[in-house]
């Protein structure tokens, strides 16, 4: 038993409060949004923003991670009446890496029914969409993407080149349904993760970001990983992947899922490898299949499956600078070479789809041959695998399984567009999910920046979700601070992409913050930013007093050199001059029109002399 309840970050954002937008179609659908309150007298209305933080920033909710979050989707699932509960698979010693005794992470004690589709029923969001059915989940994400508005606000958009995307001015549940039906978008929502707030991944919606967490064989605990998840979603992570590779994988994952309001993804091959003591050659389909069912019953929303790495592609990596850098890809390659057999994930892909279909788990087809250096970008191995992923996507779609495609990696800027073009062509517009890409290899410790450059570009070109990179990339396991840095960096990249592709409302936040900056409304600047805490802390390092928040300058320029203060002076001077000039012009016109009424006619000088 636990001696105490671990605490997590659960305070509201400054000058913000959570509110819930009621659906007009579904009485039991209420969509959470965050309202940022701006300075009284500013003339600005409160500003609504998309919110991923779940109940953790709702001051009216009491958080207890031993109980988990409310199961908001249970009523929706019950109304559809196409799922059933059944006895769960028993937890085995190998599920937690053979950990026992005091080293075993406590079991999450609050039990819930395990669901699966009823025999003969298809319960995926793609099935409903293709049948013309609008689900509560589809309505939920439409409201969420609109940030609660039903009409597009006017804005000044600097660019709207969306590279053949079809972005509506207002999202509707019908638009969402159509995007899912044709495979251009997914709503990753395992029926066994009812705590999850629906979100959508697709190129015609706002660009999403994923944050990776997870323990390793040498570090981290359940409390740390739950806190990392909560911390990541506070700052804007749309999904979280649990990439745990050490002990207690099963129990830690249960704690994470029960307390997560965002979709949770995994790479099942990692846990399967732990079950065979880390010996890749000992992996079997039966072990992997059992792992998929274990994770699906827990509520994992999407699986990364490295089924596109075929035996014939492995020789294509021999002359690479950095070989195979994907952990999952290297595991599969080692198994294939040892057994001289085709990838068992490729061979059993039909069965993988059947399992995913039973629980509405989305598939994220892994890029096991992604380039790990810019020298290897866009090579034959990478695109051979991508072509295979496109073929596997068609198989998944035939079974109504929602699918997205994973992408690179390390790619210099001039080669990024080709990646997007190839993916769209080979994978029939299935959502693209990329790791960066990193645009240079010379900056260990700063790869959150090298990758954000590529992420912003490929997001503009059409990538639907960006996997964050932290400063610890290539160096170590990220801690809580690294997670925040990675998430904020990728929120910037995603927002920059949304601006470039002309997403409705994207520029409104920029415009609102810019007005606050020009008006020296310091608190509004802080509160409208992605990271209010850091913005306020940087300002207060040199001007900490509350009176400084009313100053019309900061420590960068001081009062005499502040360009915005000078701009205000120029505006005031121009306004005064304009008023004065307009007054003088009006008087001149008046004199010209009626001068004879005010001026005495004087005799000429000559007439005066003659007299």
UniProtKB/Swiss-Prot annotation:
InterPro entries: ThiC, ThiC-associated_dom, ThiC/Bza_core_dom, ThiC/BzaA/B. The keyword Transcription regulation does not apply. Substrate binds at residues 212, 241, 270, 306, 326-328, 367-370, 406, 433. GO terms for cellular component: cytosol. Binds 1 [4Fe-4S] cluster per subunit. The cluster is coordinated with 3 cysteines and an exchangeable S-adenosyl-L-methionine. Its EC number is 4.1.99.17. Keywords: 4Fe-4S, Iron, Iron-sulfur, Lyase, Metal-binding, S-adenosyl-L-methionine, Thiamine biosynthesis, Zinc. Pfam families: ThiC-associated, ThiC_Rad_SAM. [4Fe-4S] cluster binds at residues 554, 557, 562. It catalyses: 5-amino-1-(5-phospho-beta-D-ribosyl)imidazole + S-adenosyl-L-methionine = 4-amino-2-methyl-5-(phosphooxymethyl)pyrimidine + CO + 5'-deoxyadenosine + formate + L-methionine + 3 H(+). Zn(2+) binds at residues 410, 474. The keyword Ribonucleoprotein does not apply. One of its GO terms (biological process) is thiamine biosynthetic process. Pathway: Cofactor biosynthesis; thiamine diphosphate biosynthesis. One of its GO terms (molecular function) is 4 iron, 4 sulfur cluster binding. Its cofactor is [4Fe-4S] cluster. NCBIfam families: PRK09284.1, PRK13352.1, thiC. Homodimer. PANTHER family: PHOSPHOMETHYLPYRIMIDINE SYNTHASE, CHLOROPLASTIC, THIAMINE BIOSYNTHESIS PROTEIN THIC. Belongs to the ThiC family. Catalyzes the synthesis of the hydroxymethylpyrimidine phosphate (HMP-P) moiety of thiamine from aminoimidazole ribotide (AIR) in a radical S-adenosyl-L-methionine (SAM)-dependent reaction. This is Phosphomethylpyrimidine synthase.
């Amino acid at each position: 038993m636990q001696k105490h309840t671990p605490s997590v970050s659960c305070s509201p954002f400054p000058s913000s409060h959570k509110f819930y937008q009621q659906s007009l179609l579904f009485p039991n659908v209420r969509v959470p949004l965050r309202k940022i309150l701006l300075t009284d007298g500013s003339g600005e209305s409160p500003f609504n923003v998309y919110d991923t933080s779940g109940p953790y920033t709702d001051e009216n909710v009491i958080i207890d991670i031993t109980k988990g979050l409310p199961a908001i989707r249970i009523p929706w699932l019950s109304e559809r009446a196409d799922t059933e509960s059944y006895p769960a698979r028993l937890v085995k010693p190998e599920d937690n890496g053979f950990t026992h005794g005091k080293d075993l992470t406590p079991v999450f004690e609050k039990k819930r029914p395990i669901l699966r589709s009823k025999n003969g029923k298809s319960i995926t969001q793609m099935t409903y969409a293709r049948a013309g059915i609008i689900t509560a989940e589809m309505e939920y994400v439409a409201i969420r993407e609109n940030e609660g508005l039903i009409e597009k606000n006017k804005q000044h958009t600097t660019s709207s080149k969306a590279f053949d995307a079809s972005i509506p001015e207002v999202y509707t549940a019908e638009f969402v349904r159509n995007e899912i039906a044709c495979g251009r978008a997914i709503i990753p929502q395992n029926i066994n993760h009812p705590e999850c707030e629906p979100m959508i991944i697709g190129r015609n919606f706002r660009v999403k970001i994923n944050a990776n967490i997870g323990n390793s064989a040498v570090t981290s605990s359940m409390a740390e990983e739950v806190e990392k998840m909560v911390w990541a979603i506070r700052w804007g992570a749309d999904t979280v992947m649990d990439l745990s590779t050490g002990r207690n994988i099963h129990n830690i994952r249960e704690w994470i899922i029960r307390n997560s309001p965002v979709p949770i993804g995994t790479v099942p091959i990692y846990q399967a490898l732990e079950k065979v003591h880390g010996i890749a050659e000992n992996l079997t389909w039966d072990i992997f299949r059992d792992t998929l069912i274990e994770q699906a019953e827990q509520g994992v929303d999407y699986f990364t499956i490295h089924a596109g790495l075929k035996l014939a592609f492995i020789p294509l990596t021999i002359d690479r600078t950095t070989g195979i850098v994907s952990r999952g890809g290297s595991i599969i390659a080692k198994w294939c070479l040892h057994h001289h057999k085709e990838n068992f994930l490729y061979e059993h892909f039909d069965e993988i789809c059947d399992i995913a279909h039973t629980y509405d788990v989305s598939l994220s087809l892994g890029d096991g041959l992604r380039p790990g250096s810019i020298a290897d970008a866009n090579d034959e191995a990478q695109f051979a695998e991508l072509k295979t992923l496109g073929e596997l996507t068609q198989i998944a779609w035939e079974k109504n399984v929602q699918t997205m495609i994973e992408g690179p990696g390390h790619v210099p800027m001039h080669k990024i567009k080709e990646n997007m073009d190839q993916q769209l062509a080979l994978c029939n517009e299935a959502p693209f999910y990329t790791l960066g890409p990193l645009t240079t290899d010379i900056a260990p410790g700063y790869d959150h920046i090298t990758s954000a450059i590529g992420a912003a570009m490929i997001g503009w070109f059409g990538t639907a979700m960006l996997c964050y990179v932290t400063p610890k990339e290539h160096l170590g396991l990220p801690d809580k601070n690294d997670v925040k840095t990675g998430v904020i960096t990728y929120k910037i990249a995603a927002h920059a992409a949304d601006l470039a592709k002309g997403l409705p409302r994207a520029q409104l936040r920029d415009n609102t913050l810019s007005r606050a900056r020009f008006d020296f409304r310091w608190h509004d600047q802080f509160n409208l930013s992605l990271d209010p805490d850091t913005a306020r802390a940087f300002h207060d390092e040199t001007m900490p007093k509350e009176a400084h928040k009313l100053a019309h300058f900061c420590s960068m320029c001081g009062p005499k050199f502040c360009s915005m203060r000078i701009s205000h002076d120029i505006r005031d001077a121009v306004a005064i001059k304009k008023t004065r000039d307009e007054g003088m012009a009006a008087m001149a016109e008046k004199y010209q029109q009626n001068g004879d009424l005010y001026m005495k006619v004087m005799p000429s000088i000559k007439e005066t002399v003659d007299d």
